[in-house]
Amino acid sequence: MPRRTDLHHVLVIGSGPIVIGQACEFDYSGTQACRVLRAEGLQVSLVNSNPATIMTDPEFADHTYVEPITPAFVERVIAQQAERGNKIDALLATLGGQTALNTAVALYESGVLEKYGVELIGADFDAIQRGEDRQRFKDIVAKAGGESARSRVCFTMAEVRETVAELGLPVVVRPSFTMGGLGSGIAYSTDEVDRMAGAGLAASPSANVLIEESIYGWKEFELELMRDGHDNVVVVCSIENVDPMGVHTGDSVTVAPAMTLTDREYQRMRDLGIAILREVGVDTGGCNIQFAVNPRDGRLIVIEMNPRVSRSSALASKATGFPIAKIAAKLAIGYTLDEIVNDITGETPACFEPTLDYVVVKAPRFAFEKFPGADPTLTTTMKSVGEAMSLGRNFVEALGKVMRSLETTRAGFWTAPDPDGGIEEALTRLRTPAEGRLYDIELALRLGATVERVAEASGVDPWFIAQINELVNLRNELVAAPVLNAELLRRAKHSGLSDHQIASLRPELAGEAGVRSLRVRLGIHPVYKTVDTCAAEFEAQTPYHYSSYELDPAAETEVAPQTERPKVLILGSGPNRIGQGIEFDYSCVHAATTLSQAGFETVMVNCNPETVSTDYDTADRLYFEPLTFEDVLEVYHAEMESGSGGPGVAGVIVQLGGQTPLGLAHRLADAGVPIVGTPPEAIDLAEDRGAFGDLLSAAGLPAPKYGTATTFAQARRIAEEIGYPVLVRPSYVLGGRGMEIVYDEETLQGYITRATQLSPEHPVLVDRFLEDAVEIDVDALCDGAEVYIGGIMEHIEEAGIHSGDSACALPPVTLGRSDIAKVRKATEAIAHGIGVVGLLNVQYALKDDVLYVLEANPRASRTVPFVSKATAVPLAKACARIMLGATIAQLRAEGLLAVTGDGAHAARNAPIAVKEAVLPFHRFRRADGAAIDSLLGPEMKSTGEVMGIDRDFGSAFAKSQTAAYGSLPAQGTVFVSVANRDKRSLVFPVKRLADLGFRVLATEGTAEMLRRNGIPCDDVRKHFEPAQPGRPTMSAVDAIRAGEVNMVINTPYGNSGPRIDGYEIRSAAVAGNIPCITTVQGASAAVQGIEAGIRGDIGVRSLQELHRVIGGVER
């Protein structure tokens, strides 16, 4: 049937900030949906709080609201559009993850959707309830002829304990309506049951948990299905988890299609999945169903269902080329599967199920090193921060590619020293799921363990173990062969081994370069195959490629002949990780779109299945490949070889994807690959402290005193000369990796040892730490002559908090005209001194009226999307054009940049935008179950960001906090405990809270100071202080755990006070989901936000409206 004619205006809800369990796959799906709906002539309103998303670019919706995704704010959007005579007809909430779904449910249940006549499309309320509510779903599975794990839904701890007594330990605890397994876990004791179920009841919006029998160790599978209004159903993809049940699917290595199912088992799973889909009632969209199979007897049970586009949907889309989100959006507005044409073939309908003639492997990326003390055991609560995907003609080829795509310290088997111990130690490690267990599987096999013993220890299916065992056998051949001949080398490449891995086994080849030389001499290059959804039955219209080393030397590549347009290769940012996330993908996507429009043929290279950059229609050609020197060079080689004539490859862009492509710049340039934009030598100049220090001295720009050290003695001497505290860090890092503020010699000695191990080829940098300075961030463009200031951001937290974790305001709220003039002058001098062509990010610290230069990065920064949204100027697009030869004057004339002026000075009536970091502390626990510390420092820990934008700072800050963590309290009790150095600064904000009606609790020293300043407060004792007669009986931590505290202000004591007490306070706040502020500036900002909330005049405005006010550039 044709699309519905009664729908004219659709509201799409995004997923908000990148968090563990809900990442940029929903930007990918939401962007597709918005494109589809607008192409169909529908008006689109969008709500999403994440400025780093492509979907919040103004061109993707008619009304783009960068506002908190809460029922209250979404209702304001619906009401505003209705008041303007532009009624919203339908709400599409199935493409924004659990956040969007929960918000839609709340709007339905509160009567808001009925009040404004808004229909839920994609999945109606009943379908959502049937799919998400544990008990109802269990009944549906039984009705469909399936089986669920024995379980019971519990609403109280008494019911939980009763159920555990019936089922026996261990049990699995699962809250309803949460994502990423938040609050779930396997409980082996009654204490663990109490802890997990208590947390689960708190995490579930519906305040219930499912207690179910443990199926730990069973095999796990997923099906991605779609259904239309005529009851046509397609199974898009089957996915198998390599890790068994007990490890969250987001933390497991997964494979598509499923490898170890028999045809009978697959058909049974498929039939049951379709029956469940029909019973649940998802009739215009997609869903994901998870199954478990007992490897001993084949018993099949249904675990759960997501009645929406999920993380696995994005993986299935990229794995098959079947655009699930795009088709789901079309189904939601009335189309049927047979009416939708498959974009990739251009002739088959969407009711044709995809067929794969390749294997896809996804692997998770973790960040445990960022959270010392966190338990690294993998459980049913998701902990990975990103993922990589690869495609190959066989499992081991795809596995090898994905392992090097992760960009960890190990780039595949045999690329790092083995851990100590023998077979038994390796098998012992395998019994506890943890990051990198594939390496232990290979090691145990190499040391002589049988496939059966390794399978028993790990719970991994013997088929996968046997595949890795074949690699062990191949390794033995490679080591033993007298000469590495063409046949053996081709076989090694066919099995996914990199030149680096082969070089580690053949020392006589003198490293990776030697292996490459031999390969080139023997004519061994990969061929590039095409993802076409139909195993080559129909010709693909969209060039989406992956590499494979075929055993047949005559195998042909499928890269299309080159056009007459010059080509530009854009290197993406790889898997998301802390310090390098969606913000860099945003810049890569902007480069692809603007350069295509400017007459270039754009070629994207990336390996992240969650991103918009790896959508098949973002660039003119896509290579789903690891971002290593070898793999990128082969793509360049393939592009140069594809067809004759034409201008060839104009250059490679390394400046937009973060540290990953930047780290390849020198080697690529040395190999003859043209790097466009800022040259590699200039990048080196900015990274080299000595050379950069000379540049600053020549320009008369102050910088904190510093020194470089390779030994503890050198570091101690430098620290004594410049004075403690000092900031120590390794060179060439992103996200503040390994940074620390050091207050004394003992701490310095411990750091030097660790830092040297972290980056042995680079020295340690020791800087004077500027306490109480205001940190400033600047994004600027330079075309080699003119500098354009994109935006000047003032950090809310003081210097010492990593810029990625600090909230910031744009335009700056406390900087004067003279400060901004200093910033402009310094930025221009640095851009010209380095030789920047493209983007530049500079960080400054302002202390006692002196502007110090902290660092300069001649590349796209993580703040580029935020600045672009706040100022209406697309900096990444302008950067891409400049790198390919355009001037700032030319871009002003075209309207891409402001015709006059730049982002250094905002219009008088410009709104204030606040960026806030989103931190994942609640996801991690120590081995004893306690929460980890939420203290911020120079090492970045945030996974994502939100933006609040309004007419004044208080309102914008309030929005940013609501979007990131939930509303700031408007009343209640605030607990205050601060370091001596912060007590004077805290008097005003705490007094204001007391005047607003808050009750103040404080520990003895802080309470005494507050009372002396006329602030009434009640005492609580410190956590480790014993109870004494006449002293408070309740400790600060007791009060927080008892739910008597609504906000915590706790600044750290450095090395001069009771740090352990601060940890207990902050971790209790994290565990109770209570706002916890750890800086004086953060407390002052929070007070302004609370005041704005109490005034109650915080409204909503679309970006399009705000950009007209700013007088920015229409894109």
UniProtKB/Swiss-Prot annotation:
Cite a single GO MF annotation. metal ion binding
Coiled-coil residues are none
Annotated region (Allosteric domain), positions in chain:
966-1115
Repeat as a keyword of this entry, yes or no, is yes
Q: What class of enzyme is it?
A: ligase
Which catalytic reaction applies to this protein?
hydrogencarbonate + L-glutamine + 2 ATP + H2O = carbamoyl phosphate + L-glutamate + 2 ADP + phosphate + 2 H(+)
Write down the required cofactor(s): Mg(2+); Mn(2+)
Residues annotated for Mg(2+) 2 binding in this entry: 304, 306
Which amino acids does the record list as binding Mn(2+) 4? 855, 857
Which positions does UniProt annotate for Mn(2+) 3 binding?
843, 855
Q: Per UniProt, where does ATP 2 bind?
A: 729, 768, 770, 775, 800-803, 843, 855
What positions does the entry give for ATP 1 binding? 134, 174, 180-181, 213, 215, 220, 246-248, 290, 304
Q: Where does Mg(2+) 1 bind?
A: 290, 304
Q: What is known of its domains?
A: The large subunit is composed of 2 ATP-grasp domains that are involved in binding the 2 ATP molecules needed for carbamoyl phosphate synthesis. The N-terminal ATP-grasp domain (referred to as the carboxyphosphate synthetic component) catalyzes the ATP-dependent phosphorylation of hydrogencarbonate to carboxyphosphate and the subsequent nucleophilic attack by ammonia to form a carbamate intermediate.
Q: Which HAMAP family match?
A: CPSase_L_chain_B (MF_01210_B)
Family note: Belongs to the CarB family.
Which named protein is this? Answer: Carbamoyl phosphate synthase large chain
- Gene (name only): carB
